[in-house]
Amino acid sequence: MRKAIIAMSGGVDSSVAGLLTKETGDECIGATMKLFHNEDIGVKREKTCCSLDDVEDARNVCYRMGIRYYVFNFSERFKEDVMDRFVDAYEHGSTPNPCIDCNRYLKFDKMFQRMRELEYDYIVTGHYARVEYDEEKNRYLLKKAVDDTKDQSYVLYMLTQEQLAHISLPLGGLRKTEVREIAEKHGFVNARKHDSQDICFVPDGDYAKFIEQYTGRKSIPGDFVDTEGNILGKHKGIIHYTLGQRRGLGIPAASRLYVCDISPKTNQVVLGNNEDLFHSELTATKVNLISCESLKEPMRLKAKIRYRHPEQEAVAWQTEDGVLHVRFDKPQRAITRGQAVVLYDGDIVVGGGVIENCIK
């Protein structure tokens, strides 16, 4: 019998993942990571995670399953590796994905450390993706979920071979409707609970307001400029803008203007037309490859530049310094620094990295 830690968010997915694991006969405990509570900033919304209600829901489910339940306090690590990184990225003109950082540094790093300390064998999560071992390649592979509408392989591209060897994703072969049916059948209190949709520490979606509250600093106004460098007006501070943004600029113009670039060095926000947002190539750093050791030779595949962005035909390769280059068959709109680019070969995740630059 192996021993599993069920990483429980309080939602229906991780609860059913835990149930399916328990039914295999393995010894299980449930654990919720205490990261950041919305109540700490006086906010409560239904479609976020990390609330006190979520902890109670997870505890209730564990009670029904007859397994022990724990709360691991990782709030200090969350502040350092997720919230601080989020703020720093915005202040440097990037648009980060904190959910990927949470997986990278908390769920599949800090939780792994706790797993080893407790002498457990593997971690179970409610992510919609699949892990399979390829005998020929002698490697673990990360694959898309059967339910395309819920696939979360994009936010797991950073997983290493060591981590994949100690992860179970029981929902990868199920559809969301099936998961809810299982939860209802077993009387789980969260069977019809909303999926979390917002960043847990910015539940109202106002990133600039959060950053100012978090740092205690007001954002510094600067210039809006066109693509030639001509001043068009004043902006409220670069943390208020992201690539492709059109609303809230406050600049009168004969044609629609979009945020085409953000320069933290000059504190300028570059505005242009829609065509200025399209680029054919990007570079990425912090690269992690899963299905292979390297991409020294160009490989034809598909790439996603955002979580909800459709996959696009492309060619990818690495230079000697390890930087990932991705060239698209068709120019892509609003390739954004700080977001992840994830590469797919069919339903297999090849790997990915953090977007650094884009090239026309």
What do the predicted segments below correspond to?
Residues 126-360:
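AMP-forming adenylation/ATP pyrophosphatase catalytic core
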